[in-house]
Amino acid sequence: MEINEIVKKFKDQREVLAKKFLADVDADAYLSVHSKAADEAVLEILKLNGLSEAVAVVAVGGYGREQQFPFSDLDLLFLLPDDVKDKDLKTISEVIGNLWSLGLTVGYSVRKIEECLEQADIDITAQTAMLESRLISGNAELFKTYSDTIERSLNLKKFYRAKFIEQQQRHLKYHESSYALEPNIKEAPGGLRDLNLSLIHISEPTRQAEIS
């Protein structure tokens, strides 16, 4: 399948999904199916460009949760083995170029596991996204090592402290109020960011037990 065919298929799927959503208003179903449509497009592009199976292609953040909103960034991590080939790096660049053709903003990182750990240590947003990772294609063994390593490196008290500081700073931008003529339903108090923080906190009882 050529890139123009992949793009047309994806855009047609999005149109059908939008019409179905307006008829059914089932947000959970929409986000799940839209994420799967994005997966299909990504897989077709990976096949088109011939990316090596040595690389793990990972969905992160909302996309990793299979909650890909229609105009949200398509967030991907290209996870590299230690002995990555120059050819693979070139192919990744070609893949990223084709992904932009889908009409979505592509947020991406290209890292080895050690580099992921370094980034997680200095960037709470990146660390959060890494905790919501899902393998799309490629090196499953490398992905498992990455997931286990990220999980083991997680300092829960430090993580939640940083998340709540991040939340407080975000709330200050909106005067700590959810009331506005044009509320920001993603960033403002009580919005999607706060909902996601709550879901992260309650998602795994074992994590709660560790910090209680």
What does each model-found stretch correspond to?
Residues 27, 31, 84-88, 184:
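Alpha-helix N-cap/helix-initiation motif
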Residues 1-53, 71, 175-176:
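N-terminal regions immediately upstream of nucleotidyltransferase
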Residues 27, 110-199, 203:
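Active-site phosphate/pyrophosphate-binding segments
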Residues 9-12, 37-44, 94, 101, ...:
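Charged, amphipathic alpha-helical oligomerization/scaffolding segments
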Residues 201-212:
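Single conserved hydrophobic/aromatic residue that forms the stacking wall/gate
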Residues 35-39, 43, 49, 89-138:
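Conserved catalytic core of two-metal-ion nucleotidyltransferases
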